């Protein structure tokens, strides 16, 4: 008699480059949360839960590298609980949680609070800590203490570190415990009041623009600092063609550099804001069609490692206002993977999408990578 906790997934095609069953159509038997058998055909029994999906696929559980669940401080936008539900509904089994909240997540106790709030949920949450105390960009936070509590990465997120000396100290300090420093590349001094990408569209709309230069200067600075300190850095979301080229050069120089972009930057561009659509207002801004194409090519060539949702929810009443006063950011974790499957398969194969939305994020964070193989935990997305 089979255990009632068994789940039999019928006739799905495996998409997992680390699995011996990659691109094969199989049945997968899950027993007590572990993959117990994979075969071309497994006989079902009455007390098994049977899962059948027409033309279905199974891949390692997706991981959303950049999400903001807004708790504590902005629970009216979203809570950890509702964020978990959104991520699971989007097919994710893990997320990286951004720290720039009110209060900033800059101490061991804040990391512990986040971990405790997520206990007992099927979603793996890796909270990021801030680089600086209070996220104010002036003094290093308690990075190692936060690391011991479960923070694997550090970033000031929406308040990018403007002080080169602080970034240098962060990269140097993180080397002591193999922590990851994440940069959101934006030199705010270039265009502190920008609303969207600076170009033909912003001029036609009469809006202050954010030039690609603001991103590219910051990337050049942080790559130089990383090289000097022999450190490790990840650029969270890049948006321009020149950024792709600069990071490609750094990888060719064997620097420990990785980067990601958002699903929105791969599918849309600044022309989609022509009707003042606040849903497309984000940081970094959507840039030109040429930049959009360069990002896709960057993924194909392995320069861009991660596709993230860049999930930043806001309540409707502050979104449905005039474009200049609408906040940056929008929802994403519940729709990022469906968007990728709908809009990107003409450019990227499914295995590449899985790598950038499951395997690569976990590799960069140095956390366990799910594998579709007998004896491994059933951390899967169907």
Q: What function would you assign to each model-found segment?
A:
Residues 54-118:
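Metal-associated gating/positioning segment near the N- to mid-region
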Residues 1-45:
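N-terminal metal-binding scaffold of metallo-dependent hydrolase/deaminase domains
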Residues 108-124, 172-183, 335, 339:
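Alpha-helix-loop-beta-strand connector modules within alpha/beta enzyme cores
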Residues 141-307:
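Histidine/acidic residue-rich metal-binding segments in metalloenzymes
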Residues 65-78, 126-139, 208-212:
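Active-site mouth loops of central-metabolism enzymes
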Residues 12, 33, 55, 66, ...:
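Divalent metal-coordination and catalytic microenvironments
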Residues 42-58:
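Active-site metal-binding motif and surrounding structural segment of the metallo-beta-lactamase
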Residues 204-230, 301, 306-307, 312-382:
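His/Asp/Glu-enriched, well-ordered alpha-helical/loop segment
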């Amino acid at each position: 008699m089979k255990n009632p906790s068994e789940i039999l997934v019928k006739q799905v095609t495996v998409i997992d480059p680390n699995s011996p069953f990659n691109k094969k159509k199989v049945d997968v038997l899950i027993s007590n949360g572990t993959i117990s058998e994979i075969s071309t055909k497994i006989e079902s029994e009455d007390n098994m839960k049977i899962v059948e999906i027409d033309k279905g696929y199974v891949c390692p559980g997706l991981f959303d590298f950049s999400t903001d669940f807004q708790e504590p401080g902005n629970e009216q936008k979203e809570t950890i609980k509702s964020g978990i539900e959104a991520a699971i509904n989007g097919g994710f089994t893990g997320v990286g949680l951004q720290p720039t909240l009110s209060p900033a997540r800059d101490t061991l106790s804040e990391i512990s609070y986040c971990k405790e709030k997520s206990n007992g949920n099927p979603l793996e949450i890796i909270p990021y800590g801030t680089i600086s105390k209070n996220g104010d960009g002036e003094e290093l936070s308690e990075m190692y203490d936060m690391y011991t509590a479960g923070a694997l990465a550090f970033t000031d997120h929406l308040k990018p570190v403007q002080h080169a000396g602080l970034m240098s100290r962060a990269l140097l300090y993180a080397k002591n415990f193999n922590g990851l420093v994440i940069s959101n590349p934006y030199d705010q001094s270039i265009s502190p009041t920008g609303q969207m990408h600076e170009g033909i569209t912003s001029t036609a709309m009469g809006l202050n623009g954010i030039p690609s230069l603001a991103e590219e200067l910051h990337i050049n600075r942080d790559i130089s600092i990383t090289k000097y300190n022999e450190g490790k850095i990840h650029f969270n979301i890049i948006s321009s063609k020149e950024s792709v080229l600069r990071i490609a050069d750094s990888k060719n120089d064997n620097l420990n550099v990785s980067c990601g972009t958002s699903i929105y930057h791969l599918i849309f561009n600044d022309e989609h804001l022509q009707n003042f659509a606040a849903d497309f207002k984000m940081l970094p801004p959507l840039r030109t069609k040429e930049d959009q194409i360069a990002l896709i090519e960057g993924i194909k060539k392995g320069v861009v490692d991660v596709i993230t949702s860049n999930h930043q929810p806001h309540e409707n009443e502050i979104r449905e206002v005039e474009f200049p006063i609408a906040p940056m950011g929008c929802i994403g974790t519940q729709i990022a993977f469906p968007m990728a499957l709908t809009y990107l398969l003409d450019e990227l194969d499914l295995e590449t999408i899985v790598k950038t939305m499951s395997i690569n994020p976990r590799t960069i964070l140095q956390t366990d990578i799910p594998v579709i193989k007998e004896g491994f935990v059933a951390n899967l997305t169907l």
